[in-house]
Amino acid sequence: RLPALAELFALVKRAGDPKLRLALETKINPLAPDDTAAPEPFARALVAAVRDAGLATRTSILSFDWRTLQTIQREAPEIPTVYLTARQRWLDNVGRGPATPWTAGFALADHGSVPKMIRAAGGKVWSSFHGDLDAAQVKEAQALGLQVLAWTVNEPAQIEAMLDLGVDGIVSDRPDLVREAMARRGMGLPAGIQVTP
């Protein structure tokens, strides 16, 4: 059973650690509008729930559907947004030229690179599928003031490759392996957080 959002918020509050943050990903598909919520009302409802829980400063909202992120940036600038991208056969929300239904009117052809698209959209955090990242993109994004996160990085070789690229964060189902790789490199490790359901 998936917990309701209110249950998740209650768990976070019970943990009692103000450093505990939430990353909430919207699952809206502009290619299947009859199967998912409309982005603007959904984003507004999500913002209201986060604010009502008093967790706006501890929550980031992620989405492949940038329309959602544009609404959140307008309605709740205090809530960080994270621009998700994939440029794969199984999902390409960025496209190769004109704007796609995913990118809220921002087009690769108009900006020349994904980091520039995200910057133009008002984004500050880019979370890319790890297999799409290279050193030049990471460097460009960071020079534009973007934080770069890589997802979902579970294999030791992939983790090492992302650390070599200098990404700002790694999304992983195996945080133990990420921490081990960071420790081997002498990188500072964040303290763990204990949460009892």
Over which residues does each language-model region extend?
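C-terminal active-site rim and adjoining tail of enzyme catalytic domains
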Residues: Y83-L84, L91-P197
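Metal-dependent phosphodiesterase/phospholipase catalytic core, i.e.
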Residues: R1-P80, L84-Q88, A99-W102, A107-D110, ...
